[in-house]
């Protein structure tokens, strides 16, 4: 048996098998995260994209595929799902249509070609999120339903025990969040990571909502609050993705969804989103600090923890009376 290894050829052959023997050309790797790889290829001149699951990832890509199908039916702009399943060697995959456009936030926020898009994106985001939240929960069996605050409270406690660090700004945020949690009777499908970087944008505006692997059942205001987190403004002072105002986002969402959108709930989820991102930065940095995965990139992410502490203080400004702080 030959010891020759051809990963690209092997992947092309695997894709060809699931596409009934079609010829695969132009197979090019685009990215490779911790849990999945992304490749572009063509079949009969049509550009497609495949995401292949890495070993060790416990998330079910079939659930993600079912969300994509339901999202398309609900009117969410998403890439067309071609096929999903499991390769012979066991790795799960999703193949989708290629959507032309830009995902890099700084280009979307600054390049002249997107000037017209910038004027319409907040409204388009509101409409897209209203469609996401209209997906019938029964159509997407298998989505987790977790208490986000409890999950990240436990994560911070575990990190504090391992790293022996103090993060008083995070504790302040938890204290405020616990005392001001909004009452919400709505439970919907939530995208879980809706922001610049996870949407495809063209000169005409929003073209597709991408990256559904964190979808879950929760409060729909979570998606709107995450979109307002300061880290996702990429240097712009405009609070909604660096593009517009919270008032415009809420008005557009109410018009598209027919459901009231509480500005206080939006702020609550914005604070929680900022806290979550800070703890997520800690989690990534801890992999380096604890020796699990030595990486300059992971170590550098650790410096963003203090940025999020600062962002939390800004987000809580003017709310000290609810904390009992003079």
Residue spans for each PLM region:
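Juxta-kinase regulatory segment immediately upstream of eukaryotic protein kinase catalytic domains
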Residues: 1-20
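Conserved N-terminal boundary motif of the eukaryotic protein kinase catalytic domain
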Residues: 21-28
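ATP-binding pocket architecture of kinase catalytic cores
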Residues: 28-172, 182-186
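Conserved protein kinase catalytic-loop anchor
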Residues: 187-189, 207
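Catalytic-loop of the protein kinase fold
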Residues: 189-191, 196
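Activation of the activation-loop gatekeeper triad in protein kinase-fold domains
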Residues: 210-215
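Active-site activation/catalytic loop segments of kinase-like enzymes and analogous catalytic loops
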Residues: 222-258, 272-291
């Amino acid at each position: 048996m030959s010891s020759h290894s051809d990963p690209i050829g092997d992947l092309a052959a695997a894709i060809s098998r699931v596409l009934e023997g079609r010829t695969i050309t132009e197979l090019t790797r685009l990215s490779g995260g911790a849990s999945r790889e992304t490749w572009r290829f063509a079949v009969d001149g049509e550009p497609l994209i495949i995401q292949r699951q890495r070993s060790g990832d416990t998330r079910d890509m079939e659930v993600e595929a079912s969300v994509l199908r339901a999202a398309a039916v609900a009117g969410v702009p998403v890439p067309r799902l071609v096929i999903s399943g499991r390769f012979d060697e066991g790795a799960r995959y999703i193949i989708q249509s290629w959507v032309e456009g830009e995902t890099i936030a700084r280009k979307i926020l600054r390049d002249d070609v997107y000037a017209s898009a910038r004027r319409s994106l907040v409204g388009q985001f509101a409409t897209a999120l209203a469609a996401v939240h209209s997906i019938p929960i029964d159509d997407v069996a298998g989505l987790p339903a977790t208490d986000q605050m409890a999950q990240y409270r436990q994560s911070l406690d575990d990190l504090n025990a391992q790293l022996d660090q103090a993060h008083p700004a995070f504790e302040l945020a938890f204290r405020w969040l616990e005392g001001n949690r909004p009452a919400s009777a709505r439970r919907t499908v939530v995208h879980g990571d809706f922001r610049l970087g996870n949407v495809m944008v063209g000169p005409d505006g929003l073209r597709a909502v991408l990256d559904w692997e964190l979808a879950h059942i929760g409060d729909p205001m979570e998606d709107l609050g995450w979109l307002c987190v300061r880290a996702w403004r990429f240097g712009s002072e405009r609070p909604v993705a660096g593009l517009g105002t919270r008032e415009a986002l809420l008005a557009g969402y109410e018009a598209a969804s027919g459901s009231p959108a509480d500005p206080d709930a939006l702020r609550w989820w914005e604070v929680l989103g900022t806290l979550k991102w800070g703890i997520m930065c800690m989690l990534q940095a801890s992999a380096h600090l604890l020796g699990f995965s030595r990486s300059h990139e992971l170590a550098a992410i650790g410096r963003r923890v203090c940025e999020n502490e600062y962002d939390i203080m800004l987000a809580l400004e003017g709310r000290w009376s609810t904390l009992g702080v003079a």
